[in-house]
Amino acid sequence: MARINRISITLCALLFTTLPLTPMAHASKQARESSATTHITKKADKKKSTATTKKTQKTAKKAASKSTTKSKTASSVKKSSITASKNAKTRSKHAVNKTASASFTEKCTKRKGYKSHCVKVKNAASGTLADAHKAKVQKATKVAMNKLMQQIGKPYRWGGSSPRTGFDCSGLVYYAYKDLVKIRIPRTANEMYHLRDAAPIERSELKNGDLVFFRTQGRGTADHVGVYVGNGKFIQSPRTGQEIQITSLSEDYWQRHYVGARRVMTPKTLR
């Protein structure tokens, strides 16, 4: 009997010991599995977050690089445009200066006891005047020629400057040009020769309307003047006792006494 009781007590003790441990063991195992799963999930989320952050940073860096490249390109284009503009202006300026220097020659007139007087003269080889200016000069020259030709045959008169009174050499020139040019036409041949607004002209470049000067009596640089009418001839009022006439420049007398020519009718001097 006593043996049965000990066996019963032992079984009860074993049963009491086994029953409470089984749920706890299961609970502990489940907790461990849950903790492991949570850790794996957190690690995966952290990796995903890190990957997303890196991707965002990479995209931002790429966008910034593109922006910088565009900015540099725009700046380079702007600088190139400014440089091209400056180069074009410089070339244009040099071309204008080159044309200007090629179009004009400085000619100087020496006068005893005075400083040399220099003026810029348009070169014949540099091209013609603009059409409008050329037409204006031609029209004025034609008017002057008509006025002069109408005086042929009238007597010389010292100090005269009108068809009513007659003309001396400078009076004839004064009458022909005084209403056509805006510069003051002097009343003596010597003053006309030294007129600042009249350009010196080579004999080979003479045109209708140019003034031709002579030194016939040794007074001043020039003491006689006529007007070139083309074909190597000029119109003049010679001296007392003679009439206004057309004379050839090739005559020995006039060749010996010729001193130069001036052009008073230009686009700059015409009214």
From Swiss-Prot:
A molecular-function term among this protein's GO annotations: cysteine-type peptidase activity
GO BP terms in the entry: capsule polysaccharide biosynthetic process; cell wall organization; peptidoglycan metabolic process; proteolysis
Biased composition (Basic residues): 55-64
Disulfides per UniProt: none
InterPro entries for the chain: NLP_P60_dom, Papain-like_cys_pep_sf, Peptidase_C40
Pathway recorded for this protein: Cell wall biogenesis; cell wall polysaccharide biosynthesis
Free-text disruption phenotype from the record: A triple mepS-mepH-mepM mutant is inviable, whereas a double mepS-mepM will grow on a nutrient-poor medium but not on a rich medium, suggesting the 3 endopeptidases are functionally redundant in vivo. Depletion experiments of the double or triple mutants lead to cell lysis, as well as significantly decreased incorporation of mDAP into peptidoglycan sacculi and increased amounts of the enzyme's substrate (Tetra-Tetra-anhydro muropeptide).
Keywords: Cell wall biogenesis/degradation, Hydrolase, Protease, Signal, Thiol protease
Keyword Signal among UniProt keywords: yes
Residue span, NlpC/P60 domain: 138-265
Domain of life: Bacteria
SUPFAM superfamilies hit by this protein: Cysteine proteinases
EC numbers, comma separated: 3.4.-.-
Pfam families: NLPC_P60
Biased composition (Low complexity): 65-86
Catalytic residues as annotated in Swiss-Prot or TrEMBL: 169, 224, 236
Region entry Disordered, spans: 27-102
Cleavable signal peptide: 1-27
Coiled-coil regions listed in the entry: none
Function noted in UniProt: A murein DD-endopeptidase with specificity for D-Ala-meso-diaminopimelic acid (mDAP) cross-links. Its role is probably to cleave D-Ala-mDAP cross-links to allow insertion of new glycans and thus cell wall expansion. Functionally redundant with MepM and MepH. Partially suppresses an mepS disruption mutant.
Similarity section: Belongs to the peptidase C40 family.
Protein name: Murein DD-endopeptidase MepH
Protein's organism: Escherichia coli (strain K12)
